[in-house]
């Protein structure tokens, strides 16, 4: 095995600490070519699609990418921001905010972000850390709930990059924070602030709040993945924080792909059923997405909205994701700080002179 080239070891190295925020990824542009390139990497991950790769790659290259590339590009174009992809824009802002928060609290750490698929990739970010003298790294996935298809594959990519290093840094990982009080508080604050500006649903009249999480195949639950249970845990804690019952608030799962059974209830059919049942207002919030992206802006804000209205609903609200909310940045900083304990994150103080 060939190892990456590295500078000579030195006792005068920076011995710095790096915090790497890791998100899923996004195409570089809302074009069919860029989207196909992104989807090819994403859907080729055996953690994401757990069927024999020899069969899957034929289907992927001959049917799925040609069909989905152009259709998905149109959807990305509908949500693209002047600065770029929403997921990348919001993740960059979160990174800047966490860096500023830690620095203002006396932490001497580098903070950067990487994407599991697309750019900037995890290997590049870890290489940049090494070049800056980082010897300890905290991997912080932006997925509050653990899943093999998100958290585990992000760690896989990081460990693959480490396997190519001769002089490896010390590494810690944040597995999940689905029940972390600061995260739950940030979610509740996001909902409350939205309602303060746009009015609270009339739950007594039958209005609903839907908590929509990204779906995964049901068989992953049967195989031991804790994702479903952690989504339900987050949902229950958020309902309690908002003072809502399971009649007023429902946990659902979105973004089903293929014909296999996924975690249920599905988001879009649930919203249509609400409309058909006479529910006048439905608010949808996505607690598992820490930054707005195609799945929240387009799928929820457009497709799911249309399902609800087509079913007879009158008013639909998509509550924005945490993005750069101050409570969320504070929660991120708190979770990071907890996982940095024991590492020399602050400059040594000189001994007092007697």
UniProtKB/Swiss-Prot annotation:
Location relative to the cell: Cytoplasm
Keywords: Cytoplasm, Heme biosynthesis, Iron, Lyase, Metal-binding, Porphyrin biosynthesis
Enzyme class: lyase
InterPro entries referenced in this protein's UniProt entry, alphabetically: Ferrochelatase (IPR001015), Ferrochelatase_AS (IPR019772), Ferrochelatase_C (IPR033644), Ferrochelatase_N (IPR033659)
PROSITE patterns recorded: FERROCHELATASE (PS00534)
A GO MF label: metal ion binding
Pathway(s) served: Porphyrin-containing compound metabolism; protoheme biosynthesis; protoheme from protoporphyrin-IX: step 1/1
EC number: 4.98.1.1
Catalytic activity: heme b + 2 H(+) = protoporphyrin IX + Fe(2+)
GO CC annotation: cytoplasm
Residues that coordinate or bind Fe cation: 214, 295
HAMAP family linked to this entry: Ferrochelatase
Family label: Belongs to the ferrochelatase family.
Its job: Catalyzes the ferrous insertion into protoporphyrin IX.
Record's protein name: Ferrochelatase
Gene: hemH
